[in-house]
Every structure is written in C-alpha cells, then in structure tokens.
Amino acid sequence: MDEWVMERYELAKERIAQIPDEKMAEEPYCDFFTKEAMFLQQVIHVMDHGIAGKNLEELQEQNHELYQDILPENYENSYGNPAYAQKMLGEYGKVFTFLYTELHGTIAYAFEKKAWDLTVVLELFLEIYSAFTQEEIPAEKQVKEILVSYVNDYCQDMVENRIREAIDPENNFVVEMIMDSDLSDLSYLYQSGEYVSENELKTAEFMNSLSQREIDEMARTYTEGYRMGFITGRKDITKKKTVNIRYHLGFERMVKAAVLQFREMGLQTVIYRHALHAVNRRNQFRNGFTGGIANPQFDYDHRQDSALFLDPDFVKRKLRAMQTSYDEYADLADVHGGPAVIETFGEKPFSPVSKPESWAFTEAQQKLQLELDNESGQITNRYIKGEERSFTIIAYPIPEIGEDFPEIFREIVKINTLDYKKYQKIQQTIIDTLDTCEWVEIKGKGENETDLLIHLHTLTDAKTQTNFENCVADVNIPLGEVFTSPVLAGTGGMLHVSKVYLNGLQFCDLKLVFDCGQVIDYSCSNFETEEENRKYIEDNILFHHPKLAMGEFAIGTNTTAYVAAQKYNIADKLPILIAEKMGPHFAVGDTCYSWSEDTPVYNPDGKEIIARDNEISEMRKEDVSLAYYGCHTDITIPYDELGSIRTIDDEGDMISIIEDGRFVLPGTEALNEPFGK
C-alpha cells in the first residue's frame, strides 16, 4: 500500500469510527451519517482483517450484513432507495442517495485491497459529514458541488484504472481467486465481496457435481467458439496475447478450465469486475465479472446517477482521460483479443418501478451521453481495433429458473453443442433463396400485429456475393441463424411482440414502427401511462437516440431450443442470445459489422457477405461521429406468434420460407422435427 495513501486511509478510518457516538450532525441527516459510518466500519474491518479463519456460516452472515440494506425486504427504508431518501431528507434526498451508492461500492474495494479506491470514497463521506457538523448546514447546491468535484478530481485516475484492469493480465484479483482456490469448498464464493444468493451457491454446487470431463467439454465449446470467431472472420489470433472473460459468480470450475484452454492458445486471461465508481458506471447493466444482484430495483434506480455531474466539461474530461490512458497502455490494448462472455438466465423477469425521485437525464444530458458513448467507442476502436478483435458469447441457466434446473442445464449444454454442419447446410438453402430476391415480408399471426417489409442489398455478382451470413456456433453460441444488414430505404412497418426480455428487463406488448428503416414510433404496456412506457423504451432500447435504425434482420433456425423452452415453460426467461435463434429477429442500433465494415467476410461456400453496411454506417466515410449508435438490441418474434416469412422478387412473386410458424421451404423440413417430439 502506498505510504501516502496508507496515511490518508488511517486518518479516515479513525475519524469514521468516532461518528456513530458523537451525534454532531442535526437530524434528519444524523441518521444517514450514523448508519453509513457503521456500514463503513464493517467495510474497513474487511480491508484490515480480510476473511481468513471464517467458516461458511460466518461468511454467509457477513455477506448478508454487507448487503442487507438494499435487499428487497429492507429497501423501502434504505437511503439507497431514492424515494425513501427524498422522504426523509427532502431536497437533499438525491445527493445523499448518490453518495450512498458510491459508498456501497467500497465493499468490493475492501475485498480486493484497493486502498486508493476505498480511501477516496471514505474522504468524500467525511467531507460531506464535516459540512453538516457546522453551525449552518450547507445548501443542497453545495453538497452537489462537493460530489461533482470528487468526480472531476478523480476522473483521470478512475478511468485509467478501469482501462488498465480491462487489458492487463497482471495483478488480476478474480483470476487469482479462481486459480488459487479450492473450488470444492464453497467458502471461496465469498472471497470476491460480491453478493452471494442461493443462485450462486447452488450453481457452484451443481458445477461441483459435474465430472472434469463435462466441465472441460463445456469450456471447450466456449473457447473453441472464441478461436473459430477469429478463423471465420479471417483474423490472426496469433497477434493476440489476452482475452477478457466476463462471467457470473458460481461458474468458477468452467472458467478455470477455460483459462487453461486459452493458455494453450497463447492467451492470458483478464477478468475485471463490473464498474462501481460513478465515473465508470453506465446504466444498470453490469459489464464484467459479477455476483448476485441483491436487488435489481436498486441498480435500476441508480441507472442515471451520472445526471448529477454530466455536463460538457465532464465529457471532455473523461474522453481526455480515456485517450491518455489508452496512450499509456497502447501495447496492452494492441494485443487484446476481445471478450469471451458467459451469460446467465433464469431470474424472475424484472419489471422495474419508475421513480421520479431518481436522478434522470435532461434532454441536453441525453445528447451529451450519446456524444460520450460515440466518442469513447471511437477511442477504444483506435486501440483495440474492430477489424482485428473478436468475441464469443454463451449462456447457461441458474437455479432460480425452477425445480427442473439440472435437466434444463443439461438441455442447454446439448443445445450449445448441436451439429453445426447439419444446420450450416440447411441455412445455406435458406440463404440461396433469400439471395434471389430484393424484399422479405414478415407477418405475425393471431394477436401479433407484426407486418414488416425488409429491403435487401442488390448483388452485383450472385456467383461470388451473398447478403446473409451463415451463422453457426462460433462467436454466437448456440447456433443458428442467417442474418443481414437491411437497406434502410424501403424497410418499414410494425414489429410487435407480446412479451420479450431485453438486457435483464421485461417488455410487455412491445411495438416498434419503422419508416425508412428507422424507429419513428413505439409503445409497450409495462406501465399505466403512455409517457412512462415511452420513457422506458427510450431509456432501455432507444438509449435516447431520436431515431434508431434496423441494423439487422435475421431468421433463427434453432427449433430445438424453442421446443425446450416450451417444454420447461422458460421462454420468458431465456436471454436474447438463445431467443434470437428461435424465430426471426430484428436488431435496432448498429449493424453486426460495426467498426469492421471494410473487412471482407465470407461464408463457408466462399461467397463474400456484401451487406455489411447501411446508410447510417456509410456515413463513417464522411463523419465517423454520425455512423454509430453504440447499441445493438435484438428483438425476436417467437415461432408461435409468426404467420409467415416470404421473399418477394422483382416480379412480385413470393416464395415462402415459413408459414404458420413452420419451415416450408424445400430442404428445411428437418428444422420442424423437434416440434413433433
């Protein structure tokens, strides 16, 4: 520990220990400071003494105590709840609930022994506490200024640390935890400081019940998918030295096997935790290693906490910090291969409560956030080049999915390892038909009001070119789909799904209306008012873009996954990674080729996929800031809501690919076999 940081830490620790007994702040503020000082003392104890010597029961008790304040049963009376904070503290509610969230991140810093990260947050707490012990309490504006100064003062350090831990394999806390722990002893789960629920415990127990061969095969499917992503993309994996594993606590046995398999490929593993400092957090999404989510409503309530400090000065400051940090670690960035992601699913679908007391972006801040996302994406791509990196994603269920968890898990393993050659051949039949037409019509059935017309690119040489990628199991596991980037001009109509689960959030009766390939109207039925429903979509699908293009049209072919979802009644719990293979899907946002449009991509038959651009991405040639959205959200129409998919040629003649939810194109009949089982 740096001597200067150590000195500051000791002073902060000593002062915080005095707060619960001195009662120097007035009520109602004294209650906040007393409770948070007591919480911070628990964190400091972990920092100083660790968890050595504690048995499993003691570790579980400690974990519960650290997170109990935001658990659903206690959240109504927590200062982490913006509604409660405002009720108790009035106009100060927003600044105190922001502070609460920043304090909450100290749990992880203590477990990782990140002295600097912990110390600067302790000092922030003490600075605000000190202001409230004076004769005259500070105005809300003054408290906000203290918080903004904290963010601005430490922006460079926090951004630099975040970038380095994403690409530097040295001093990697989570990797060391995995490789050095006895994974048969479930007490290892508590070493990270993440919340441990029954899901994480039972997942680890289940993983321990599998043979080493089963674990190795699961890992091999995943790591080979990553390697094949480079091969099919004609990218040189030998130039790369690191891979970033992102996963959910409980899967350590599989991750350990993957780390060893990546080593055989010449890749060292980097694992970073989801962001905790407000400077680095974005929305409610957790990008990186995570444990259980103690309360998704807490994460949702604080998704726009950056509204406290987001202004033009901060945007410039953060972009400058990113640029200087990537300059500093350019060599590490250049040899980084990209992410290998293990997603989980099975949680009870979450429909959030919208709270006016939460921080929320103004219209001006929405534009600033878009600018920040766009510019930061460009900076990242200059150092971790899109045309040289790849990725892979795979998903597994967690025990919360239900009593059939073991059977469902094994079914998903089977789905993740389907015969790709069989699907590749069938999908080529679909592509050959699609390549004969200029338009595709998609219609729903029953109460599904989908009615879309998709405009395809013109092939100048049908012998060497194709519009659709034949996607089996490499970067996107499981197989299979055929997908393209539509021409926006002429693409339009309504996309409608009765229920869909996107980015951890449930959408009911979702409708998107397209014109010239862009969303021009939208609605859902999650909330009572149209205004709330539109805002929900703006926050979580459109991400505040005035218009969002259809970046992808695809036909999913994994009927085995669909039938399994119906058998176990888990369709509403599947991640889009699997759900997108269970019917046609449409992505709003960037194309699948963003930042690498100029890199030729080929199907197994040798044909070049020429539909890598649309009218938006082509703007990069004139002004790259106009070419990308920084988002890509897939929305699937399940087979049981699907009326038809038909091609339309220049003469207006149609060929059916799917009718009444079943494949009818000659050569695709085998895809219907799972329906009969």
Residue positions per predicted region:
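Glycine-anchored, exposed beta-strand/edge motif detector
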Residues: 582, 588, 596-602, 613-622
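Extended hydrophobic packing segments that form well-structured cores
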Residues: 605-677
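Short acidic-glycine loop/turn motifs at beta-strand connectors
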Residues: 446-448, 514-518, 650-651
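Conserved AWS/pre-SET-to-SET junction and N-terminal core of the SET lysine methyltransferase domain
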Residues: 473-511
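Active-site bordering "gate/hinge" segments
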Residues: 1-489, 658-677
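Dual-mode signal for accessory low-complexity, basic/Gly-rich regions
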Residues: 522-593, 597
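Active-site and channel-lining beta-strand-loop segments
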Residues: 507-524
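Short solvent-exposed loop/turn micro-motifs enriched in small/polar/acidic residues
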Residues: 435, 503-506, 546, 579
